[in-house]
């Protein structure tokens, strides 16, 4: 919550670095005001910058002019919404809507399906409930490009020489009922050799990202591995998705399980077909998610227990003399006496420790 309020994202990154994904070519193309505005979202801005860059360059190649909020962009707020911190979501919605109005845009193009869902549905409801003017509609980049392809205004020519299958993100599919845009875009890529998984569209299995991954990484690994195996069963060599968070989860599950398939975001394959050679963000994904996962595991009861176990010598040394002597006596006592002594302390420590911790922790 503090990171959201202070830095506008949940990845622990600095707000000043939000536009760090911009290349000179993209920066020069961005308009001050435009009918379209690009909203990369947190994961594409801070973690999967190859996705943000690919999307921005694809839109440029398709002739779509767009503006961009830049450093003032905030997280869409959906993590706060689903975790019940509605007051933080309120603050975020107000900031983003105000910033977007300054760009004079009426169509917001997103990289992330969750951001699309928020801009198209949740922000609209939020604004209507408060009597605030809301002149926006949102589209995922895949839908924008699919429309241009169907109108004959955008064509891909570079053969990528792959066998691909597609994972439907839950926010885009089940929640948003957006299935055809990504498929139109995939099939327009020469050499994509697209094949569907057995469970697709409204029947597509979740990859295990978002709430599952945050709540229980071990369960998420199993869910992700099952989804990846479905992709492998199609004979595909590349599993693509149109959601940065799905990519993080699928890549993590693949790496942990050692499964033989490449994980890519759709935007990066389109950019590849257009001749762009954009460096992949896999190392950053590993680094950022590694820190995130350590914090998730630390906040579990067993994680805190392991941490406290490692810190016991330092905690004891930082205690007032009386308690330090008592704890050392317990530690040095023969086993036959140790268990009864610990049992006696069990009723005392839950009330005693909160009083001791403010003095102990600064010393530790």
Walk through the language-model features, giving the residues of each.
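Iron-sulfur-cluster electron-transfer modules
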Residues: 1-127, 133, 148, 287-353, ...
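Short, surface-exposed connector motifs at secondary-structure boundaries
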Residues: 35, 101-106, 164, 231-237
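Local cysteine-cluster metal-coordination motifs and their immediate loop/turn environment
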Residues: 39-45, 71-84, 109-121, 167-176, ...
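Hydrophobic alpha-helical packing residues
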Residues: 59, 186-187, 254
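A polyampholytic, Gly/Pro-enriched intrinsically disordered region
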Residues: 87-94, 154-168, 213-223, 280-301
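Short, flexible loop segments at boundaries between secondary-structure elements
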Residues: 130-158, 199-202, 255-293
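Redox- and metal-dependent alpha/beta enzyme cores, enriched for Fe-S-associated oxidoreductases
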Residues: 150-154, 164-218, 306
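A short, acidic, amphipathic alpha-helical segment used as a generic capping/interface helix at domain edges
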Residues: 218-237
């Amino acid at each position: 919550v503090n990171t959201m309020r202070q830095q506008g994202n949940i990845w622990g990154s600095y707000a000043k670095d939000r536009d760090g994904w911009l290349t000179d070519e993209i920066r020069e193309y961005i308009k001050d005001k435009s009918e379209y505005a690009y909203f990369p979202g947190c994961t594409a801005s801070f973690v999967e910058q190859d996705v943000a860059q690919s999307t921005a360059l694809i839109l440029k190649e398709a002739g779509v002019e767009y503006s961009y909020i830049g450093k003032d962009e905030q997280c869409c707020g959906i993590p706060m919404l689903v975790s019940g911190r509605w007051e933080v979501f309120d603050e975020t919605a107000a900031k983003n809507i105000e910033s977007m109005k300054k760009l004079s845009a009426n169509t917001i193009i997103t990289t992330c399906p969750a951001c699309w869902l928020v801009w198209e549905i949740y922000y609209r409801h939020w604004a209507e409930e408060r009597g605030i003017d809301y002149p926006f509609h949102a589209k995922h980049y895949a839908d924008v490009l699919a429309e241009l392809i169907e109108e004959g205004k955008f064509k891909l020519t570079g053969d990528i020489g792959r066998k691909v299958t597609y994972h439907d993100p839950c926010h885009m599919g089940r929640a948003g009922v957006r299935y055809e845009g990504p498929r139109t875009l995939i099939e327009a890529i020469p050499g994509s050799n697209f094949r569907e998984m057995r469970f697709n569209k409204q029947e597509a299995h979740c990859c295990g990202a978002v709430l599952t991954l945050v709540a229980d990484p071990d369960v998420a690994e199993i869910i992700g591995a099952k989804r990846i195996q479905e992709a492998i069963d199609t004979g595909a060599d590349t599993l693509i998705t149109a959601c940065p968070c799905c990519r993080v989860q699928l890549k993590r599950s693949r790496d942990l399980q050692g499964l033989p398939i490449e994980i890519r975001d759709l935007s990066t394959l389109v950019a590849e077909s257009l001749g762009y050679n954009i460096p992949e963000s896999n190392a950053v994904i590993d680094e950022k998610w590694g820190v995130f996962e350590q914090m998730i595991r630390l906040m579990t009861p067993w994680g805190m227990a392991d941490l406290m176990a490692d810190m016991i010598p330092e905690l004891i040394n930082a205690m007032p003399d009386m308690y330090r002597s008592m704890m050392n006596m317990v530690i040095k006592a023969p086993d036959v006496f140790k268990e009864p002594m610990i049992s006696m302390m069990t009723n005392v420590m839950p009330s005693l420790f909160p009083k001791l911790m403010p003095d102990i922790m600064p010393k530790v």
